[in-house]
């Protein structure tokens, strides 16, 4: 009994121990698996390349007993399959040597995996793209000075975009254009601080939210900053001062505007932008035409400009000096300057070049940096005054061969000991100025001796001009509860114009004057006549005030100014001072200095005042006494008794075949004073002279043909007229009209023509009084009727009856239905990236990751094989050496880096863990079986 009991107790202990041991094995293996997975979950994968924000210059990852450095060089293979966990470069002063690690070493750190993603490349911009399993990393090249500056302070290259690109919702309205510096010309001279201006008018569509953005791109021959080192564009503000959108420059020629909260509750958004664009001297190095383009979406605004540059100042022998301010940093008070010195193969000796800040200098500053380069290239120097001095194939540094001295105000003095007369020289200056000064001016002076001690003395000045940009926008509040929905306003515009009617009529044209009183005085003047017909010449003077102004300078051929020039008899000598008018600078203020070019002469401005009186000019000419006999009666007929007529008849000489001379003066309050002159010759046919006064000019008809002749002198017409001859004069624009053979020819002249020859028919001269002119009739007894109405003059050939009908009903233009806009396909929005918290100062225990949506399992991410890397000794800090040999690459904004929230990946020990759990489970089952058996035995 006791034996069985002991056996049962032993079996009871064995069963309980088996159950306990199996449970511990299962629990222990589960915790080991979780810990193993947590060790590898410190890698954040970037889905696509994005612009990296530079972080601190030195960072370390520390654990309890060890220091972990993560190093990464800048040369990666395009076929690499490993995605680096982070791009951190760590540098400490205690590092005894440099270590280059081609791969990223991942170590165990007591930090959450999300913290590691906050570390970025310091000093180098890296673009990362990950198509499937291939990762290619290309560093962005920076100059050495920029890399040094990054170690001192944080530099942010580009703000990451979080909104949607809504460029397709921006409509460029009519009136958007690019205008030149001067309105009346397309010539732009950057050396005179001239620039072009982009004027945009935008209308934005619906559905724009805060954070959305749009871009537009400039052509490579312009940029937005001029000589300024700042890259900025104005904000778009509403009329009440609220910011609608902020602007930034991406790269060099891409402008982006990002909308703010103002647009949330607005509709019908519009904006206008006025942005100064400066000619880029690095790309437009020579004079000529340039096509400036700005592209927004599918809309391009462009214009061609003629770019000109100043050639500098030169003496009589061709020696030239030129210069240009290249960059200006108002924050640090620094600027740089290029200067050209061209000997032009002249024998110069003791050549000295000095540079001095004449306005805006800052006393007590450090010495500037001055470098002298000899141009050894085969091409000419850039007319834009720019040089890529690091090109050793074109420029040779000869600074050490010169004698260089500095003064206390940032100036320099440079002596050319061995001047190569066949080469040109470029001087690069980098110095300081007072950024609080209102003006900045830099002067370059060249002095040298020719043979026989003739001198070359040249001065060139460069100044700075400041420009400002502006932008404004507006919008209407959205209606929260609209009264009418789906209503589209329809704007209709009707324009009606009467049709233009043209008619031609052949035959007699009658003009009738209405019976308004006309008072005028008409005087005749005598002019010499040649031939057989010497008649009275009428001259009419209008009572229009004549303004006359002239300059009373004596001994001068100039109209406005007198320029006195004084020349030195010393060939090649003399002081020549020229100011290069202004260099562009982009700033919010508009103050600055404008200077002009001055050569070796004096310009005197005439300050005299001249007064010219405008008086009425009256001309009265009397005819001389006339002698002769008239063969036949002379009649004077005056009608209607409503006018006063003074007619002095002279003696008629010659033979008139028809013997009767009639003067008929017609009605309606006309005061006429006229005198007849000599009339001679023979008239074999009927001749009529008709004159209307539409614009005080006669019209002559010869043989039924209309001839319009324009000339300024008096023509002479000779010959015989065998048929009916008529002369008609209209005064449409003080020009006579001649008709010959049915062809219309317009002739302008200012004086009355002379008509000579024999007239075999009766001659009739008809003149109406519409414009203060008398009416004469010779050789006929028929009166002349003048009728004038308000109808326009009608001329031409009509062989049949003509009816003119005028329709006064305006044409009805049917409204054009509005064409619905088909919106373009929207671009795929980029999902926002959650912010990654910064790394804490102290390590925290790992926290298991919980899926956001329970019930939906997340497949584990595929683990990429890790290549072994060089081990790092514990307790030592390594310093990476970064070799940057690639050019600066523009950063393309893409999707932000974000951590993949997925299940923990499988580790290498998962299979052994499962076996252990199975073994523990079997132990527990065995223990339970023993306990059950013991219980049965105990009952038995």
UniProtKB/Swiss-Prot annotation:
Residues 36-111, 676-746, 764-878, 892-918 are annotated as: Disordered. WR repeats lie at residues 815-828, 829-842, 857-870. Residues 908-940 form a propeptide. Pfam families: Big_8, Fn_bind, Gram_pos_anchor, SdrG_C_C, YSIRK_signal. Residues 1-36 form the signal peptide. The keyword Chaperone does not apply. Keywords: Cell adhesion, Cell wall, Peptidoglycan-anchor, Repeat, Secreted, Signal, Virulence. The keyword Signal applies. Changing residue 278 to A: Loss of fibrinogen and histone binding. It is a peptidoglycan-anchor. PROSITE patterns: GRAM_POS_ANCHORING. Residues 811-860 have a biased composition (Pro residues). It comes from the Bacteria. Multifunctional protein which promotes bacterial attachment to fibrinogen, elastin and fibronectin. Also promotes the accumulation phase and the primary attachment phase of biofilm formation. In addition, protects against the antimicrobial activity of histones. Mechanistically, captures histones and prevents them from reaching the bacterial membrane and simultaneously binds plasminogen, thereby promoting its conversion to plasmin to destroy the bound histones. Interacts with host PLG; this interaction provides active plasmin on the surface of bacteria cells. Interacts with host histones. This is Fibronectin-binding protein B. It comes from Staphylococcus aureus (strain USA300).
């Amino acid at each position: 009994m006791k034996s069985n009991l002991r056996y049962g107790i032993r079996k009871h202990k064995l069963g309980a121990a088996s159950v306990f041991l199996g449970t511990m094995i299962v629990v222990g293996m589960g915790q080991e698996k979780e810990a193993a997975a947590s060790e590898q979950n410190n890698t954040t994968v970037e889905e696509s390349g994005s612009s990296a924000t530079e972080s601190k210059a030195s960072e370390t990852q520390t654990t309890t007993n060890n220091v972990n450095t993560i190093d990464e060089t800048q040369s990666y293979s395009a076929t690499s399959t490993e995605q680096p966990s982070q791009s951190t470069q760590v540098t400490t002063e205690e590092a005894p040597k440099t270590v280059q690690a081609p791969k990223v070493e991942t170590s165990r750190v007591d930090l959450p995996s999300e913290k590691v993603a906050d570390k970025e490349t310091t000093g180098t911009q890296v673009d990362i793209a990950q198509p499937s399993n291939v990762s290619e990393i290309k560093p962005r090249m920076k100059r050495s000075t920029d890399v040094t500056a990054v170690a001192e302070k944080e530099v942010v290259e580009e703000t990451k975009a979080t909104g949607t690109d809504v460029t397709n919702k921006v409509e460029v309205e009519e009136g958007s254009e690019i205008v030149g510096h001067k309105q009346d010309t397309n010539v732009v001279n950057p050396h005179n601080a001239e620039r072009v201006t982009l004027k945009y008018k935008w209308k934005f569509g619906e559905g724009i939210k805060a954070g959305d953005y749009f871009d537009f791109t400039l052509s490579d021959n312009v940029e937005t900053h001029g000589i300024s080192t700042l890259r900025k564009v104005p904000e778009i503000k509403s009329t009440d001062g609220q910011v609608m959108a902020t602007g930034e420059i991406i790269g060099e020629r891409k402008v982006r505007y990002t909308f703010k909260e103002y647009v949330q509750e607005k509709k019908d958004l519009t904006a206008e932008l006025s942005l100064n664009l400066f000619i880029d001297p690095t790309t437009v190095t020579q004079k000529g035409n340039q096509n400036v383009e700005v592209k927004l979406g599918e809309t391009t605004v462009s214009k061609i400009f003629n770019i000109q540059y100043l050639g500098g100042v030169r003496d009589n022998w061709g020696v030239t000096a030129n210069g240009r301010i290249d960059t200006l940093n108002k924050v640090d008070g620094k600027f740089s300057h290029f200067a050209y010195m061209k000997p032009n193969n002249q024998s110069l000796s003791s050549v000295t070049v000095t540079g001095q800040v004449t306005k805006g200098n800052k006393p007590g500053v450090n010495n500037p940096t001055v470098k002298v380069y000899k141009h050894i290239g085969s091409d000419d120097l850039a007319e834009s005054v720019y040089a890529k001095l690091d090109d050793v194939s074109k420029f040779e540094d000869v600074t050490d061969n010169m004698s260089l001295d500095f003064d206390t105000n940032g100036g320099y003095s440079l002596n050319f000991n061995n001047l190569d007369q066949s080469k040109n020289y470029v001087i690069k200056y980098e110095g300081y100025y007072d950024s609080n000064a209102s003006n900045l001016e830099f002067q370059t002076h060249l002095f040298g001796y020719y043979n026989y001690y003739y001198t070359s003395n040249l001065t060139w000045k460069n100044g700075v001009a400041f420009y400002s940009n502006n932008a404004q926008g507006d919008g209407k509040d959205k209606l929260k509860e609209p009264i009418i929905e789906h209503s589209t306003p329809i704007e209709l515009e009707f324009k009606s114009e009467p049709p233009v009617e043209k008619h031609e009529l052949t035959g007699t044209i009658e003009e009738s004057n209405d019976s308004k009183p006309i008072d005028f005085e008409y005087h005749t003047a005598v002019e010499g006549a040649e031939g057989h017909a010497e008649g009275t010449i009428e001259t009419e003077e209008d009572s229009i005030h004549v303004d006359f102004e002239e300059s009373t300078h004596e001994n001068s051929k100039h109209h406005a100014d007198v320029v006195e020039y004084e020349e030195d008899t010393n060939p090649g000598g003399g002081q020549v001072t020229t100011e290069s008018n202004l260099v562009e600078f982009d700033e919010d203020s508009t103050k600055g200095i404008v200077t002009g070019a001055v050569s070796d002469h004096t310009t005197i401005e005439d300050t005299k005042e001249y007064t010219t009186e405008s008086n009425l000019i009256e001309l009265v000419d009397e005819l001389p006494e006339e002698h002769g006999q008239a063969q036949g009666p002379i009649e004077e007929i005056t009608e209607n008794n409503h006018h006063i007529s003074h007619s002095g008849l002279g003696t008629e000489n010659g033979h008139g075949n028809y013997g009767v001379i009639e003067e008929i003066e017609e009605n309606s309050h006309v005061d006429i004073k006229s005198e007849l002159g000599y009339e001679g010759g023979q008239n074999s046919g009927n001749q009529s002279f008709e004159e209307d006064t539409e614009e005080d000019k006669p019209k002559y008809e010869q043989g039924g043909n209309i001839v319009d002749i324009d000339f300024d002198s008096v023509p002479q017409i000779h010959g015989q007229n065998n048929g009916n001859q008529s002369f008609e004069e209209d005064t449409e624009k003080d020009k006579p009209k001649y008709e010959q053979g049915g062809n219309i020819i317009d002739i302008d002249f200012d004086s009355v023509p002379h008509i000579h020859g024999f007239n075999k028919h009766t001659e009739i001269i008809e003149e109406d009084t519409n414009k203060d002119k008398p009416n004469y009739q010779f050789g006929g007894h028929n009166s002349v009727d003048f009728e004038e109405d308000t109808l326009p003059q009608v001329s031409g050939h009509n062989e049949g009856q003509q009816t003119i009908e005028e329709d006064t009903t305006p044409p009805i233009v049917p409204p054009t239905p509005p064409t619905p806009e088909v919106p373009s396909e929207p671009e795929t929005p980029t999902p926002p990236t959650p912010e990654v918290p910064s790394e804490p100062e102290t390590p925290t225990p790992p926290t298991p990751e919980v899926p956001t949506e329970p019930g939906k399992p997340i497949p584990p991410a595929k683990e990429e094989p890790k290549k072994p890397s060089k081990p790092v000794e514990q307790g030592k800090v390594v310093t990476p050496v970064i070799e940057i040999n690639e050019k600066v690459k523009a950063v393309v904004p893409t999707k932000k880096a974000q951590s993949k929230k997925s299940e923990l990946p499988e580790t290498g020990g998962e299979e052994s863990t499962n076996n252990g759990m199975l073994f523990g489970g079997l132990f527990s089952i065995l223990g339970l079986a023993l306990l059950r058996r013991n219980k049965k035995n105990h009952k038995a």
